[in-house]
């Protein structure tokens, strides 16, 4: 839907790039940009595999001060299947490679199959694979108005780690 892109632009981001395999998502993002009083022509949309796109950015030395990575739990495309539990570290590594020095990576999942500890581990493994030191500076979960019922841990699905690049 482009919600993160809209918020980034509204907060003053000089450049906003949205990567999603589903082309229809980009049409919605441009429409939401327009509805928010933003020029949709200023939103760069890339309908492609995120990991491959991050690799291309790294090859071109393109870097970002802030990366918001909120992958789907599962998706499939021409390059194969993406499974968040299996592929998070790869996504973290690609993100770390294009994160500017002193940049921030917002890494999120709403998968019940990924714990907060597994999210942290993916960030650590991805950072190490990229040769980048990432430090988690904040963790966010569900807000208080989304209580989780006792005995239903699957209800605590949202995990977000905000990491800073320190090397």
For each of these PLM feature ranges, what is it?
Residues 3-14:
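Conserved SAM-binding loop of SAM-dependent methyltransferases across substrates and taxa
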Residues 90, 104-167:
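C-terminal catalytic and target-recognition region of SAM-dependent MTase-like enzymes
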Residues 3, 25, 53, 75-77, ...:
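Flexible loop/turn segments at secondary-structure boundaries
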Residues 24-25, 47, 64-94:
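Mobile active-site "lid"/loop adjacent to the S-adenosyl-L-methionine
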